Amino acid sequence: MGRKFQRMTDVDILAIAAHRDDVELTCGGTLIKSARKGRATAIIDLTAGETGTRGSAELRGRESDEASKILGVIERVNLGLPDAGLTNTPETRALLALEIRRLRPRVVIAPPLEGRHPDHIVAAQLIRDACFVAGLAKIVPGVPAFRPSKILHALAFREDYVKPTFVVDISDVFEEKLRAIQCYGSQFDNAVQAGEVYPTGEPLYDVVRHQSAHYGSLIRTRFGEPFYTTETMRVDDIATLEVNTF
């Protein structure tokens, strides 16, 4: 069921995704950077990836253990929901809501609400719904209700969706992000596409580098990871806004 580092009561950032390796591809740099700043980070993988074309669920589990060490997360959980058959039901919402209550994250990172892979689309809405359900005291009343403050959608490789609300500068941790992705050799070695990564004819690792460089260029840095939030962002002092117009 994935690598369990320790039991805990609160995390700052919880990344939730459909498959092992999704987090590494879309927001791995942000998790690494956050952990280095002293933030408590964790991951929930909704499925074990048992129907994937390459590798096996067992092998991907071992690969995720190695990647988790690089990401610096303090806990990684696998819910064991059906791969390629993920559903958003009262039962799956309650199961995920229980983990959200246990981990008590301030911020949750989810996939985009639109995507190429059916599991990713279902996962995005399932995560939003489970975060809401986690705050309803009468659902699984034996566990204290809790609701995260913020949901962010990781937008990497989804340029056909919406413009990012913001981009995290991952220039100083990009090589570590790439090493975490490379832990999934069964999925990515000699691959040219995966999940939301469209094929360009280049090796997948090169596509990740080029895409990260593109997002970094939007904020005038070397590498970046894009995010979208349904809420308008607050600014207290416009004189401190970064990213020059010229």
Segments and roles (model prediction):
Residues M1-L103, T240-V243:
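Active-site rim/loop-helix segments in enzyme catalytic domains that contact anionic ligands
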Residues G2-L14, P90-F246:
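Metal-dependent de-N-acetylase/amidase catalytic core
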